[in-house]
Amino acid sequence: ATLEMTKKELNKLQKQNEKARHRIIGLTLETRPDWINRRAILAMREMGTTRIELGVQNTNDKILTLIKRGHDTKEIKRATKMLKNYGFKVDYHLMPQLPGSTPATDLKMMLKVFDDPDYRPDMIKIYPCTVVKNSELYDWLKRGEYKTYSDRQLINMLKKFKARVPRYVRISRLIRDIPGHHIQAGNKMTNLRQVIQAEMKKEGLKCNCLRCREVGHQHTESKVQSLKSKVRLFVDKYEASGGTEYFISF
């Protein structure tokens, strides 16, 4: 398939997919909150899109202005509600360590995503800010106007966050995998999630996100052999974007 695919060709492929032995069961598109409108939503729905990833980055308007993001938190809330009303799964991209942030304010910001019912996405991806050359942030770094956290500060903050996430959310990614030689400042650990999980286990902490509770990850990462005797049904009821959500899981 190419970007030049016509509507007729797309419809044909969608019909073929319905009877294929190995079917595509989901389609994800990434965009910005301020690009979400009825026309865009109808086009994405026609393409068969099931999930939208939103570049939220932060829920503090002062920081969004400082980094010249081009949208505010009102746009985030509006887009989130609109997408949910049209039946899409919503995945937020969150970026701790942005200019103007501290580990404490980042923790507060990310917890607000679940404390405030106008947010509450289905999934999140956490991308700690890193600095590469030929960027405005690199110029800030050289002038001493921006400084990243230490690895220890970042790990400690993310441990506190993971220990408090609700059961209905999936943390589907914890870093953006950028080659280390390109990174001028910021996290370079490609296994950051594993480092955090190992420390949490030693400290008796647990992440209840959907990914961490999946049987496959329990078996391969936590070496759990059998969960049959521990299986329980959970129904999480919560308010989100003016509606009531029920998340059912085991």
Model features per residue range: what roles?
Residues 1-89, 95-152, 156:
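Conserved non-cysteine loop/helix-boundary elements of the Radical SAM core domain that shape
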Residues 2-5, 219-228:
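Intrinsic disorder/low-complexity segments
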Residues 33, 37, 180, 220-222:
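Low-complexity, compositionally biased segments
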Residues 93, 124, 171, 227-229:
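Intrinsically disordered low-complexity regions specifically enriched for long asparagine
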Residues 145-220, 229-250:
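C-terminal accessory regions of radical SAM enzymes
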